[in-house]
Amino acid sequence: STLDRSSAASDVYKRQGKYDSKAFKKSVGLNGVGVKAVNALSSRFEVRSYRDGKVRIATFSKGNLLTDMTQDTEEDNGTYIFFEPDATLFVNYCFKPEFIETMLRNYTYLNTGLAIIYNGHRILSRNGLVDLLNDNMTATGLYPIIHLKGEDIEIAFTHTGQYGEEYYSFVNGQHTTQGGTHQSAFKEHIARTIKEFFNKNMDY
């Protein structure tokens, strides 16, 4: 099948790390299905894997491998992906940069130090979730952002003088726009901790 013939794309892509490595601590989709699907539905698909002075370059058309080569390089370690959707399947398609850039920026917030180049625009976060809050806050915080980071969880929060609440929650690198039990638990325990600290009855 077309997807079977595109296995080289998945092979190149999976060389970026191992499932048990820190590279996959906050990743969504580790089985390569996504990259195979994009490959099969693209008139042109190219993936380059830069590692330790070598680069492996594979190009495809509609899932069919056209070229696969390895050569020396002086580029830094990283991955380059290019794809052009198959116009016979996606008629009059268009990309909405504002949605794509938001998604990519979220990835950099969750993976501190990760640099993503999107159509020539460099997206990078040095301070993770602290940058997320600073970039999205429309009012000055009442106190410096509190940032807690553990092996499997990271939290950053503050309060402003504005009314209302705003949350950015993620699970396995995916923005959970509708919240979830993880967000509900966070809200409940923040309120409970404040209540216990001040020893007052508060509704939450």
Give the location of each predicted region.
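A generic structural signal for short coil/turn motifs at secondary-structure boundaries
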Residues: 1, 89-93, 178-179
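Short, ordered beta-strand-loop transition motifs
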Residues: 7, 71-77, 147-150
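Active-site-adjacent bridging/hinge elements
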Residues: 11-18, 78-80, 156-168
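GHKL/Histidine-kinase-like ATPase module
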Residues: 98-101, 105-107, 113-204
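GHKL-type ATPase core
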Residues: 17-138
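Single conserved hydrophobic/aromatic residue that forms the stacking wall/gate
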Residues: 2-9, 13
